[in-house]
Amino acid sequence: MDLVKLALEIGFSHAAPLNASALRALPEVREMCASGRCRRYGSSWSCPPACGSLEECQGRMRAYTGGVLVQTTAELADDFDYESMSKAQEVHKKNFFTLARQTRLLIPDCLPLTAGSCTICRSCTCPDRPCRFPNKMLSSMEAYGLLVSAVCEASGLPYYYGPGTLTYSACILTKEG
């Protein structure tokens, strides 16, 4: 299955084979989650600490040998063009959910890691009740301790596409090179 081709057909701006051997769960990335910058730490099943310890996340990633890295790049009118930023995030999330769903049908043993926390449910049940959709839930690359810029570099895609742009990145790990 050519996941790069599928990703581009779905509408991602960029896609490349994922260098899974370069994935490293870093404590400093997880510490950014714990600092509460996105306000999802401890309140989403897809985020730390509910998504597992750094060691557990690294162990899950180690089981995979390949995959695809995908990106959505938007042009911004200026540094405060929140409308374009929000639209790009919405498009990226929608496209990634489609890619994850299709990949899970084709390759059931895969690990999708999105940009930002899971947004399948309007309100997460964490920590009071179990996840409503554990088979659809999407953790983020950052929740798994990944420094996104390093993953992009190791996989041959830029992280930054120049002034006036914003790029969202996500990946799907597979056991197929």
PLM regions and their residue ranges:
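TRNA-binding/sensing appendages of the translation machinery
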Residues: 1-19
